Amino acid sequence: MRVAIFSSKNYDHHSIEKENEHYGHDLVFLNERLTKETAEKAKDAEAVCIFVNDEANAEVLEILAGLGIKLVALRCAGYNNVDLDAAKKLNIKVVRVPAYSPYSVAEYAVGMLLTLNRQISRGLKRVRENNFSLEGLIGLDVHDKTVGIIGVGHIGSVFAHIMTHGFGANVIAYKPHPDPELAKKVGFRFTSLDEVIETSDIISLHCPLTPENHHMINEETLARAKKGFYLVNTSRGGLVDTKAVIKSLKAKHLGGYAADVYEEEGPLFFENHADDIIEDDILERLIAFPNVVFTGHQAFLTKEALSNIAHSILQDISDAEAGKEMPDALV
């Protein structure tokens, strides 16, 4: 099958082409994001493969359907950028990679928490300037702290295991449909969203973005949280109202923010803007805080995850071509 792969980078080329040796699909790698302006680049393809910041809204899907596209394969777990209702009406199948490597993101979230809490980035910067002073670098033990997790799927459960068994933290968690057996196995406690917000020393987000939880971390929830708490977001930028985070940081209520995602990351992330003037004043203000650790959506980026993603999407494409059932299908 001929597949147009949007938002592709060198690491995508390597992992997907290597895995494709076992499948033999005709792959067309495109650097551009999928938008209504670039959708025509999928001409002559039968499927498109997209990533987190590609746009697959109704307008784009109509263009793709007109080109004869029958399959949209997401090389990620989240699918908030795809209009599933429109895809269904247009008879376009949509598949995702639900569990490519929960360890990659969970381990990265731990790394971000430690970098924020122990001020590792500031320490590294100091010693490179021959400054070995420790003033202002005091952190906290994660051990025995209350760690609240919002969203306990594959990634959230791995993060909970690390916090519980690796750090000896008191882990509480919220998800709409709790799994008591999982909580017992890992060693944490399910509770209400209110308790997670109000009693946690550290809150880590591990849930998909939906219309219902957009800006679930906002001015009101931040005000209810413990003074000095840390917030970690490796899920989706839209879960957090960035303006509210900035306000809470300025008021010294939020102790620190570690994020690998940003609500308006689409036109910025995965590209080199070193010589550009960034016009997003909210982002520029956010990353200026000394108690903010911010990276460009790299939590997924491990060799194992890339290999698993490549295998999953190519297998789904092969199954679609053969008319087989696809376990990871959304539509």
Swiss-Prot record:
InterPro entries: D-isomer_2_OHA_DH_cat_dom, D-isomer_DH_CS, D-isomer_DH_CS1, D-isomer_DH_NAD-bd, NAD(P)-bd_dom_sf. It comes from the Bacteria. Keywords: NAD, Oxidoreductase. GO terms for molecular function: D-lactate dehydrogenase activity; NAD binding. Its EC number is 1.1.1.-. PROSITE patterns: D_2_HYDROXYACID_DH_1 (PS00065), D_2_HYDROXYACID_DH_2 (PS00670), D_2_HYDROXYACID_DH_3 (PS00671). The active site is at 236, 265, 297 (proton donor). NAD(+) binds at residues 154-155, 234-236, 260, 297-300. It holds the Pfam family 2-Hacid_dh_C. Signal peptide: none annotated. Belongs to the D-isomer specific 2-hydroxyacid dehydrogenase family. This is 2-hydroxyacid dehydrogenase homolog. It comes from Zymomonas mobilis subsp. mobilis (strain ATCC 31821 / ZM4 / CP4).
